[in-house]
Amino acid sequence: MRVLVKPAQSPDGFQSIALCWSEGRTQKDRAIRQKHEDRFLADSEKLAKRIALGRLRTSAKIYETIGRLKERYPRVARYYQLAYDEQQGQLSCLEDLQRKQKAESLDGSYLLKSSRKNLDAEDIWRTYILLSRVEAVFRA
């Protein structure tokens, strides 16, 4: 597993910051987003079928259901525009590819902050990994 660590500047100057990127974290982030996206799209298709079959008729209920759907999948709902056309009685789902690609480019990236200014980026990362392993031992 490859990990890249770069130092970054704190805006206030009172913290040490490390910008990290990990291949493993990238794969994990993509898998999580894909799972949520599949579920979101499946649920939006179910909603469209309910509307088409006449099970949901009032606009208020339809918009409420759209809101619940967006609330249930906030990680991926921001990349889609769900719109209900009242005259045709259809639900449309449009994907915002630019926004999605921008988020995908950040997969695997994370910031580590420390109040200890004497630590460089590598030391911050090593301390983070050590603490993560200690936490895992206590959880086991």
Task: Outline where the language-model segments fall.
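Anion-binding and metal-coordination hotspots
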Residues: 1-140
